[in-house]
Structure formats: C-alpha cells, structure tokens
C-alpha cells in the first residue's frame, strides 16, 4: 500500500533524490541553450550592468517592475563580475531554493508521492524548458528576473506561513511578512496573488 509506513519512508528518501536527479539531467540536456540575448533577456543583462556602473533605476533607466531583482543582479555584477555565468549561477540558487520550498509545501498539503511528481513536472516543464522559438521562458535566463524572484519570494512567504501554523513562533510569521514585502518589489500580479492567498490562510487559521 502506498500509505504504509515503509513505503512512506522509502518515498521520503527517494523523492528529493529523484527530483534532484531529474533537475541535473535537464540542466545538462539544456546546457547553454537557454538565452536569446537579442530579445527580452538582453535587457536582463543590460539593466543590472548599468546599475553596477552607477546608473539609477527609473531615473536613468526605464523599467516597469519592482527593483529587487535588478539590484540583486547589479550587486552580483559588482562583486562577482559582469558576465552571463554570474547571473546563471544566481538563478541556479534561486531555482534550487524555490524547488525545495515547493516540495515541502506540496508534501504538507498532499503526499510525498505528489510532491515528488510535482517536482519532476516542474523540472521538466518549467525550469529549463524551451517551448517557443524565443528561449526566454525558463528559470536559467528568464525574460524577466522579477518574475522568478517574485515566484521565489511569494512561495517563501507561504512556506514560512505554513511553518508558523505548524510550529508557531513570531519569527516565522515575521519571515513570511518579510518575504511578502520583498515580493512587492518584484511584479505586481505575483504580489497580489501571494497577498490574496496569505490573507485567506490567515482568515482560515485554526485556533491554537
């Protein structure tokens, strides 16, 4: 039976291993096939490069989303070096953190098997994929870093909120609010979705 304790223990060990293995395979299979620098992703290199040179967002550079992702990438360029590899390395970390939190969240609301299946689907369909001629829609070289950072911070807000419901602790609630505040500095539509879900969760919070 899938619900037996022994099977659950096996899945708890195998689940993360399978997701990581699929991620590594997809990374190798898609290696350096991600960006199209002449379209949207070119802006994602140009804006932080100019910020690292002293330009000011919204004053010297036109930009339509929040400042978080671009200033993070500008710091990366300033302290690590201006290169595509610097951004890709940061995006690998963003992707890894996002997958870990998604796996934990889905395991809490569903099952370990469901979390593993969702993690595999995410790695195959979204993390590295290219379904259009323009290779902008992946997490390695996204069309807009505010989208990937928005996903990370919104999921982090819900992750810490879930930990607060399970274990209590004002620090977890504060972490959830901080991540939501950071999400506000990414993309408006992602923030609105995260805030709506957070409000509903707090309204439905069971008494402790």
What are these regions (language model features)?
Residues 1-28:
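Start-transfer (signal-anchor) and selected internal transmembrane alpha helices
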Residues 2-5, 193-208:
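Perimembrane helix-loop-helix junctions
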Residues 32-47, 57-72, 82-85:
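Extracytoplasmic catalytic/substrate-binding loops of multi-pass membrane glycan-assembly enzymes
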Residues 67, 71, 81-100, 119, ...:
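Loop-to-helix entry region of an early transmembrane alpha helix in multi-pass inner-membrane enzymes
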Residues 84, 98, 120-153, 160, ...:
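Aromatic- and kink-enriched transmembrane "portal" helix at the membrane-lumen/periplasm boundary
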Residues 89-118, 123-128, 156-160:
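Transmembrane-helix motifs of polytopic, lipid-linked glycan transferases
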Residues 149-175, 202-207:
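Membrane-interface transmembrane helices that cradle and orient dolichyl/undecaprenyl
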Residues 172-188, 194-199:
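Membrane-interface alpha helices of multi-pass inner-membrane proteins
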């Amino acid at each position: 039976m899938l619900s037996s304790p022994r099977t659950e223990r096996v899945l708890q060990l195998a689940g993360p291993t399978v997701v990581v293995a699929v991620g590594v395979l997809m990374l190798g299979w898609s290696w350096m096939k991600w960006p199209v620098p002449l379209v949207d992703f070119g802006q994602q290199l140009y804006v932080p490069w100019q910020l690292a040179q002293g330009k000011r967002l919204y004053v010297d550079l036109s930009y339509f989303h929040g400042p978080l992702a671009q200033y993070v990438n500008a710091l990366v360029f300033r302290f690590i070096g201006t290169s595509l590899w610097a951004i890709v390395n940061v995006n690998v970390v963003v992707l890894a953190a996002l997958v870990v939190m998604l796996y934990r969240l889905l395991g809490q609301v569903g099952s370990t098997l469901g979390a593993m299946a969702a993690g595999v689907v995410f790695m195959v369909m979204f993390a590295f994929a290219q379904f259009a001629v323009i290779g902008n829609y992946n997490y390695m070289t996204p069309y807009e870093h505010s989208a990937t950072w928005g996903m990370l911070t919104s999921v982090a807000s819900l992750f810490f909120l879930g930990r607060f419901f399970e274990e209590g602790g004002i620090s977890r609630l504060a972490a959830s609010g901080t991540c939501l505040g950071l999400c506000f500095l990414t993309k408006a539509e992602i923030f609105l979705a995260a805030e709506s879900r957070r409000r509903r969760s707090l309204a439905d919070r069971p008494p402790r």
